[in-house]
């Protein structure tokens, strides 16, 4: 049974989160959690929370056995960007894009 968990508007760019997502795609859930625990990136914390949520959803909603679960799909889409202004010299200003992302994790017992 496939179970989904999402984190929308995560405050990290999709490019940075995809680096972490690629590490756990296709792995068993226990192995994926170990990898994320020892990955020294902010995105790893975000992905780990979503993965733990997907595991809890599978256990609670579908009655799945945690030992059989695998990360079948994980993908990261771009979310909306917040536009900010940084003042520069001689009256100019630069636009700063504070990027967000949508993290989706799908776990399955097959």
UniProtKB/Swiss-Prot annotation:
GO terms for biological process: assembly of large subunit precursor of preribosome; cytoplasmic translation; cytosolic ribosome assembly; response to antibiotic; ribosome assembly; translation. Changing residue 93 to S/T/V: Abolishes translation elongation arrest of SecM. The wild-type allele (erythromycin sensitive) is dominant over the resistant allele, and is also dominant over the temperature-sensitive allele at both low and high temperatures. Part of the 50S ribosomal subunit. In TnaC-stalled ribosomes forms part of the binding pocket for L-Trp with the leader peptide and uL4. L-tryptophan binds at residue 90. Disulfide bonds: none annotated. The keyword Ribonucleoprotein applies. Belongs to the universal ribosomal protein uL22 family. GO terms for cellular component: cytoplasm; cytosol; cytosolic large ribosomal subunit; large ribosomal subunit. This is Large ribosomal subunit protein uL22.
């Amino acid at each position: 049974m496939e179970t989904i968990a999402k984190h929308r508007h995560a405050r990290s760019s999709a490019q940075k989160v995809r680096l972490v997502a690629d590490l756990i795609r296709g792995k068993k859930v226990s192995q994926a959690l170990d990898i994320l625990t020892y990955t020294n990136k902010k995105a790893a914390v975000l992905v780990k929370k979503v993965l733990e949520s997907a595991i809890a959803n599978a256990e609670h909603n579908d009655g799945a056995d945690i030992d059989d679960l695998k990360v079948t799909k994980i993908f990261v889409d771009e979310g909306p960007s917040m536009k900010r202004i940084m003042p520069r010299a001689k009256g100019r200003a630069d636009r700063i894009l504070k990027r967000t992302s949508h993290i989706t994790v799908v776990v399955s017992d097959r």
